[in-house]
Design a protein with these regions (language model features):
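Flexible coil/turn and secondary-structure edge motifs
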Residues: 1-144
C-alpha cells in the first residue's frame, strides 16, 4: 500500500522498491463491529514502537500503518488516544493512495500453510477468534 510506481509484486516490495508497505484490506459492517474494536485488535497485533519492522520482519515494507478511505478523523482521534501509551510511536496514519492485491499464493496464506510464520502471538489470535465468536453470537441474537 501507498508506494510509488505502477508495477508491484511481492519480490519488488521485499526489495523496498517503490516504498510499498505490506498491507491487508479490511472491509467491515459498522452494524456488526465498530471501528474502535478493529483498531483495538490491530494494536494487539502490532508493536507500535518498532520502526520499519515487526518482530523478526525487518524492512520498510513492514512499517505499520492504517491507510484509510473514510473515517480519517475517527482514526486519527483513536491514534492520538493511544500514542501516549508508548515511548516511541511509529504507526503511519494517512489516506490510502494505492493498494495492490498480492499474488494468489499469498491469499489465505495461513490457511494454505498452517505451520507458516506469523508474527502475531497465539494468545492474540485466540483473543481475536474469541472476540469474533462473541460478535457473531451477539449479532445472531435478534432483539424485538
Amino acid at each position: 500500500a501507498n508506494g510509488e510506481g505502477t508495477y508491484v509484486n511481492y519480490a519488488s516490495v521485499c526489495t523496498g522498491e517503490g516504498n510499498y508497505k505490506e498491507a491487508v484490506a479490511v472491509a467491515y459492517d459498522e452494524d456488526l463491529v465498530s471501528l474502535t474494536v478493529l483498531l483495538d485488535v490491530f494494536f494487539h497485533c502490532i508493536d507500535p514502537s518498532q520502526y520499519q519492522r515487526q518482530m523478526d520482519d525487518i524492512g520498510r515494507q513492514y512499517q505499520t500503518g492504517v491507510y484509510y478511505l473514510q473515517d480519517g478523523e475517527k482514526i486519527h482521534t483513536y491514534m492520538d488516544s493511544v500514542r501516549d501509551n508508548y515511548d516511541a510511536f511509529y504507526v503511519e496514519c494517512e489516506p490510502l493512495r494505492v493498494f495492490y492485491t498480492a499474488e494468489q499464493y499469498h491469499q489465505s496464506y495461513l490457511q494454505k500453510h498452517p505451520d507458516g510464520y506469523c508474527h502475531i502471538p497465539l494468545k492474540v489470535m485466540r483473543y481475536v477468534q474469541d472476540l469474533n465468536r462473541s460478535l457473531q453470537k451477539l449479532n445472531s441474537t435478534s432483539v424485538d
